[in-house]
Amino acid sequence: MIDQNTGPLSAEEAAKEVILAREHAEAITIVLVTIGPSKALGQRIAVKRSQDGTLNILGAFEDKKLNNRAISLAKSSLDSRRSEDLHKSEVTTVSGQTYTLFVETYVPEPELIIVGAGHIAQPLCSTGIMLGFKVTVIDDRKKFVTQARFPDAHRLIEVDFNDPFKDVKISLNSYFVLVTRGHKYDFECLRILLKNDVEAGYIGMIGSRRRIRATFIQLVNDQIDPKRISQIKAPLGLDLGAETPAEIAIAIAAELVLLSRKGDGIPLSQKENIFKRFFDDT
């Protein structure tokens, strides 16, 4: 974390930081004092998260408790990954002053990188677009990465699986789904992702239990950090009993929503249990 403690930001400085963050596909939260002592009204700080996950604190409030609370709120808002997350929070400082903070977050559009342009990739691409992802589809077969097969994709890239991500940015804002036509391609792509200095926001791989176990053994033998290996979602997706490509795509998309929105995956009917609460007298 980088702390640039230079006093509060002006409105112009905060606006410039938002513009810069958007230009570099970085997430940023602005925290503004809307109610409090007159000298503090309109003061701002910003907390920016770079693509490698580094936090940069820009500006500072004079009151230490207020400043710490503002930074904490900004971090929580950034962790939510929700663009234009708006909320207010009250803070009472040691001196007894009460402040109201307005928190506004901007996050870049998440990118879904589908590795492998087969049958699952087509419905997953369409679903990803509907969920607000910029979708990139990559494959080493030119006839598969076509506009006709993926009319809604933002990018279609023919690659060499020995260096599949040379034109793809790996960041916390990147969601990688490995659904290639063969284990060796999935493994090579996975190995490259895990050896990258910057962690992806999500890495999921399709496959049977046997195939995934073999993949993990290979990664351990390649001396990949076990912590990085543990972050792989494999088999990817939620257990919906999916069988068709479209159903599997929905199961994968559901996991992406679950993780990005920090859900629990429990059916709402089970959580609310309306019948038992209101109609079951036993």
Locations of the language-model features?
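Short, well-ordered alpha-helical microsegments
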Residues: 121-122, 186-187, 212
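A short acidic, amphipathic alpha-helical/loop segment
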Residues: 127, 188-193
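ADP-ribose/adenylate-binding Rossmann-like module
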Residues: 138, 175, 180-183, 192-218
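Short, charged/polar "capping" segments at the starts of alpha-helices
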Residues: 143-147, 211-214
